[in-house]
């Protein structure tokens, strides 16, 4: 497994301090895309990380703590209220919906979403994940539902646009991607 010196990787960034949390294993996956827009894919997983633990997190003074894992279990549910005691919480919800089962990646709804979304200031989801969470295919309606459940600002990505809802207005911006590889 390749080792990356995170402090060195981020050293050119001004005012950025990196606090790496180590795992003996890495997340290793392969994605096969089924459509040119890359909205639907099949993922196989060879390895996952050890879950982050609240007792490992240093005392960090930051305005926002961004929680972004690659699969369920990377960031345990208890990390969300823990982070909210220190800063505003931003979360990429894929870490709560993507489960590794039999070497593959499958999506399941987040059972504790209604309990934990009130701790979340910024919620990032893609259109498919928003549908899993809410059962709604209309992205604006899904954003409104996620807001009602407690998230304060919702960002939903789709291959055609980015949608943001702040509890008052729906904002959209078309995506004109030059390249979707690596999405």
Predicted regions span which residues?
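Conserved N-terminal subdomain of the carbohydrate kinase-like
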Residues: 1-69, 73, 78-88
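Hydrophobic residues at beta-strand termini and immediately following loops
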Residues: 21, 172-173
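Residues that form or immediately flank small-molecule/cofactor binding pockets and catalytic motifs
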Residues: 23, 94, 159, 178
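Short, flexible active-site-adjacent loop segments at beta-strand->alpha-helix junctions, enriched
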Residues: 71, 93-95
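Short glycine/threonine-rich catalytic loop with a Thr-x-Gly-x-Asp
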Residues: 176-183
């Amino acid at each position: 497994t390749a080792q990356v010196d995170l402090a060195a990787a981020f050293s050119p960034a001004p005012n950025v301090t990196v606090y790496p949390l180590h795992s003996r294993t890495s997340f290793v996956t392969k994605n096969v895309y089924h459509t040119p827009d890359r909205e639907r894919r099949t993922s196989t997983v060879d390895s996952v990380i050890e879950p982050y633990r609240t007792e490992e997190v240093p005392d960090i003074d930051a305005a926002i703590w961004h929680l972004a894992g690659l699969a369920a279990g990377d960031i345990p549910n208890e990390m969300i209220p823990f982070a909210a005691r220190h800063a505003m919480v931003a979360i990429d919800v894929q870490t709560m919906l993507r489960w590794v089962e039999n070497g593959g990646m499958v999506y399941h709804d987040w059972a504790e979403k209604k309990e934990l979304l009130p701790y979340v200031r910024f919620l990032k989801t893609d259109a498919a994940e928003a549908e899993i969470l809410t059962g709604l295919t209309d992205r604006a309606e899904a954003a409104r539902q996620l807001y009602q459940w407690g998230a304060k600002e919702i960002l939903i990505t789709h291959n055609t646009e980015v949608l943001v809802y702040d509890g008052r207005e729906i904002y959209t911006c078309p995506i004109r991607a030059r390249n979707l590889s690596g999405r």
